[in-house]
Amino acid sequence: MKKNILLLSLFIGLSSIAQDATRHFFYLGESKVKDMDVFRKNFPVQDAFTRKMNEGIMNNRVAHISETGSLYILSFIDGDENLGKYIANRATNNNKFREANPKIAEEMSNNTDGAWRRSTWIMINALEFLPADYKMENYNFRKIVMRTVPANEQEAFEKQQLQQHELGLKIGVKYLSVTWKAVDGYPTNTYMTILPDNSILDFYTHYADRQQKRYNSKEFNDSMKTGVKSNITRIDHLSRVY
């Protein structure tokens, strides 16, 4: 019953978002563990099982640890139908994993420190700034910025983000990023921008250069004084675990 309610609320939320030919999602699980070494030992087994059970449904999966000790496990899915299948089958697949790997499942459960928070996010296609050959496994670091915007100004916010990116390119500011919007699990006026790089050192070396170029541009600074005001709710630095 709870699963049906979740799916219903999810697709009601999706129905309010403009339809694209293929929509891109990720399903996010957040929690903490007591011992990262135990997680590192067991997660590859659980990950391989999850990939096998979701073959043809899930495109990719990646786990990160944040500087605050939180786990971020992201499962990437293309298309509404596949998203529905993934969510509908998740509990059943977890039960099958426990049956097939009881010792590992118990270790992982006992190692969890707190409840899991689960959420679903949809890519804002116009705010994807990644190369055609991008592979997430080639980048071991990600900065995430979560923010909320007024519910009635989301479209204006997305246009503003695109304009600022294009203005940045004019002054030589280049970086990788992709912005996602919450569908379920967070307020639906929440956006998450993910900025991948090779390492936190590389990211902030490049960041300092970008900030200097922005600081020197009157046009860019003027653009920041107007438009939709957003409220940053979280900044985190993620290191790839697996």
Feature annotation, model-predicted:
Residues 1-22:
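Bacterial Sec-dependent N-terminal signal peptides
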Residues 18-242:
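Short S/T/G/P-rich N-terminal loop/turn motif that feeds into the first structured element of a domain
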